[in-house]
């Protein structure tokens, strides 16, 4: 049986050859420097570029870095695959586009000692207008319909205790498209202790987002159905 570690960094990746080296290097410099007993699990979601080969080169040099490959199934599926492969007592969920800086990870790790989760807040945020509008809509929907109070529930920067990641794997439907938001919902409905931390958000250095405006409507409808279904099955724990 694989040996448990203190921290697993879970990083989905799809066609990120332009940024993956920077993303991995930052984990090594900023995260591994804080937590000695840690690993990085990069899930290549069927990339058609050199993403996997670049990750493999890192893995060949550093045993703490693991590459997991799967057929293209989307960001949500890759995240769930990474959580299944992770061995950490806590999991740090990040993206491979290197938009969120990790220089403040030490503060995140220290805050996690007294919390179930630390959730980032991108401020200021550097994304296309349609994504900013979508984030505001999702925030309002989550607060009003599902009592999820966090400022940035879908942020790709969450440090979460293992028990909550396992709970996500229990309730998320097969092929979940928004597991990161589901995790925020579980934390809120489970009365978890959550710290919100402002994180540095940078303009995208390379590659392109996998969801274009034309596909966004279908994705949002599927995501809403998924959220509503899980919300109906997960009771609210009162504090």
Give, region by region, the residue ranges found by the protein language model.
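Short, well-formed alpha-helical segments that are part of the catalytic scaffolds
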Residues: 16-31
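Conserved donor nucleotide-binding strand/loop of the catalytic core
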Residues: 38-41, 52-85
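Short loop->beta transition adjacent to catalytic acidic/histidine clusters or analogous donor-positioning motifs
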Residues: 5-8, 28-41, 50, 63-66
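Hydrophobic helical membrane-anchoring modules
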Residues: 1-5, 171-239
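Acceptor/aglycone-binding surface of glycosyltransferases and processive sugar-polymer synthases
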Residues: 70-85, 102-177, 204-219, 224
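Short aromatic/hydrophobic "clamp" motif used to bind/position activated sugar donors
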Residues: 91
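A conserved acidic beta->alpha catalytic loop
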Residues: 44-53, 98
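Donor nucleotide-sugar binding loop of glycosyltransferases
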Residues: 16-19, 47, 75
